[in-house]
Amino acid sequence: MSHVTLKNSYQSLSDRLNLFPQGAPPTELLFRILEVLFTKEEASLVALLPIKPFNVAAAAKIWQKPEAESRKILETLASKGMLLDMELRDEQIFVLPPPMAGFFEFSMMRMGNGYDQKLLAELYYQYLNVEEDFVKNLFAGGETQLGRTFVNEKALNSDNTLTVMDYERASEVIHTASHMGIGACYCRHKMQHLDKACDAPMDICMTFNGTAQSLIKHGHARQVDVKEGMDLLDQAQQHNLVQFGENVQNSVAFICNCCGCCCEAMLAAKRFAVLNPIATTNFLPKVSEEACNGCGKCVNVCPVEAMGLVSAGDPHNSKRRKARLDESLCLGCGVCVRACPESGLMLQARKQRVITPVTTAHRSVLMAIERGGLQDLIFDNQAHWNHRAMAAILGVILKLPPVKQIMASKQMKSRYLAHLMKPRNFVHLEH
């Protein structure tokens, strides 16, 4: 197949994926990835699907195919991890996930799943780690990020334990999820095919709730209970892995257990540090000048190179070193605190709390506004939005800070939206 034919075959699917708030810049590498994951027919059909959740009847109408045939196609795509499907109010609902966090990861969460995973690993590495456009927009395209850091709860002392909200705790996500699934770490699995993987645990990628339900159903993840989930969390923390999860308060879909050498989020944090590509915790480690002996263990375990060693300024020992934190780089994960053998580090609250979006819809609207794609989120030309769906989006917008509301209004160029955002016209639209 020539490059021109390939591009023509998958351009429409690429255009569809680029409508997600985090985007998916169309490049030759993306077309090659899509060719591995989708047949030509699948690509043409998926390109027509809406971004919002849909049922079989909606897909059948869009495709102009019988419902039975449409259901079979949708279930095949779900079995490949290219769609998510779940039961919602006794109805089977399908969702087209974004490339990340989405079907890129799903394609590598199960060993030997029918894909050429070595080829995918090579393509993903080039698209994410060599080319810059996609990963930069994914992690640093605006103020609101796709993922956030969870604090290592064992690094908290008795004082700051009381200030941690439930949604800031990975343990709370595990205890309250309706479903929990475990799959292979996409990042380390990818690096394994490139002979670049570290020795951190592989079978430790955590998915939750509806996402886990679908991945478990189709064999991309194995179901685990709370006890095993907590055991795996402890195992991850023993290996100094950082808990990086979906940047929402409610119904978290995933928590990755990240190393600093393989994982996309940590690599992005180092690559685009000044752009704050990952939402931090509400904590920062403080170095005790008295207790720190300059051993450097905190430097070695920091996944984003926020810790360094500098001269301790000891007039009696010119070689003595002490740890110094670069607060602008620090995620506040607490890995360094647990690694210190001298108890020379302690987590303290940041001066300003980090705001976490409440729901996926809330985060998606913020990301879309900041990345200039709100019109794509609302006016998805394949989706027939009902009043309830539109009201939910508008309800999120009307709860945003004034600056974000102005950005939304400018993007939409909507007199109706501008009228709604006048203080006297504020209404509660979500119910």
Regions found by a protein language model. Give the residues of each.
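A short, conserved structural fragment
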Residues: 78-89, 307-308, 345-346
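Short acidic, hydrophobic short linear motifs in intrinsically disordered regions
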Residues: 52-63
